[in-house]
Amino acid sequence: MVSRDFDRDKRLLTARQFSAVFDSPIGKVPGKHVLLLARENGLDHPRLGLVIGKKNVKLAVQRNRLKRLIRESFRHNQETLAGWDIVVIARKGLGELENPELHQQFGKLWKRLLRNRPRTESPADAPGVADGTHA
């Protein structure tokens, strides 16, 4: 079982790590008040970066609450998100949502991100390999 902590290795920390996701996102999940950008990281665990600016969420209390709730949701879903670098970008109105609504919205966003993940075809899944026939 993967630990559900949120240590330094589970966070995007440097500008270079954020730029890698911004420059070439593989997964993009827009929501009404949020945008998720994701990129595969080649690691066995996911990493999270948050972009919650004063322009979109005015009060520091709201920004801190959002960060806390997003990190908590990420922590509980990190087993299914393994191998991704994810950047969450807040849009106007995100700070006005209530906590249960935020939990529900992020649960749906994580699932949508997983649905959009490009599938890597293993040799056993390739046509003709599993049944012994060749093209």
UniProtKB/Swiss-Prot annotation:
Q: Which Pfam families match?
A: Ribonuclease_P
One of the protein's GO biological processes: tRNA 5'-leader removal
Q: What does this protein do?
A: RNaseP catalyzes the removal of the 5'-leader sequence from pre-tRNA to produce the mature 5'-terminus. It can also cleave other RNA substrates such as 4.5S RNA. The protein component plays an auxiliary but essential role in vivo by binding to the 5'-leader sequence and broadening the substrate specificity of the ribozyme.
Q: What class of enzyme is it?
A: hydrolase
- Annotated GO MF terms: 3'-tRNA processing endoribonuclease activity; ribonuclease P activity; tRNA binding
Asked if the keyword Nuclease belongs to this entry, the reply reads yes
Q: How does it assemble?
A: Consists of a catalytic RNA component (M1 or rnpB) and a protein subunit.
Classify the source by domain of life.
Bacteria
Q: HAMAP family under this entry?
A: RNase_P (MF_00227)
Q: Which reaction does it catalyse?
A: Endonucleolytic cleavage of RNA, removing 5'-extranucleotides from tRNA precursor
Going by the UniProt record, its keywords in alphabetical order are:
Endonuclease, Hydrolase, Nuclease, RNA-binding, tRNA processing
Keyword Lyase found: no
EC number(s): the record gives 3.1.26.5
Q: What is this protein called?
A: Ribonuclease P protein component
Family assignment from sequence similarity: Belongs to the RnpA family.
